[in-house]
Amino acid sequence: MSLLTINKLTPSVGAEVVGLVPDQLATDDALGAAVLDALEDNGVLVFPALHLDPVAQVQFCRRLGEVDHSSDGHHGVAGIYPVTLDKSKNASAAYLRATFDWHIDGCTPTGGEYPQKATVLSAVAVARRGGETEFASSYGAYDQLTDDEKERLARLRVVHSLEASQRRVTPDPTPGELERWRARPTHEHPLVWTHASGRRSLVLGASADYVVGMDPDEGRALLAELLARATTGDKVYAHSWSVGDTVIWDNRGVLHRAAPYDETEPRLMLRTTVLGDEPIQ
């Protein structure tokens, strides 16, 4: 018998999990394994009105893998990072504007870290208008290619950079901004990610700068076309937040972005990230 009661939200990505209480997620190892299996099948899991407190959120994530502590210090609970445009709550809020574009977390690490396995967000305060989080399957993006496209794209490699993602929201950066962006190393990844499971996905999104060996404009046009095909309305689940909602997604197989909202709105999400254990290859 399944440990999770799941209702599909769209045919392509997303499912709602009902009937759980926070203590179950925080303490039940078998439930953690069931969540990972459900993520593989659905990409995104929504726990409506769960009201998972920060300590329990970190405990839950420990049942899925190793918790990322690289951003500790922004919140009183280690492993929690406040996602907000309010600089009084997050000194690095300016960088979060890039999350309004489709992306996969972890394509431009500071070192050799792998992309994150999963990300959890819990809603503390929500915007009155906008601020949804949208998801699209990067596995689905690959599966929907023609055989000829799969063969051609399998040979391509793409350079990803922090500068590429930041220029989308700050097209005329100051010298200081450029210096900070370029201090982060660029990373070259295959366009097609062959996962340990045998599944394949496309590595797309805001950090994808150019295709190696292609004319820059032609390469960027190809990346834009693939992203547009992957994120048409029928392939997207948009989560409209309510206070107390918790959402987890498979970062390795799902593109995501935040819908724009008024920066004066007190939108606040608490994020915990589960570290990855699989390189893009």
What function would you assign to each model-found segment?
Residues 2-248, 252-281:
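Fe(II)/2-oxoglutarate oxygenase catalytic core
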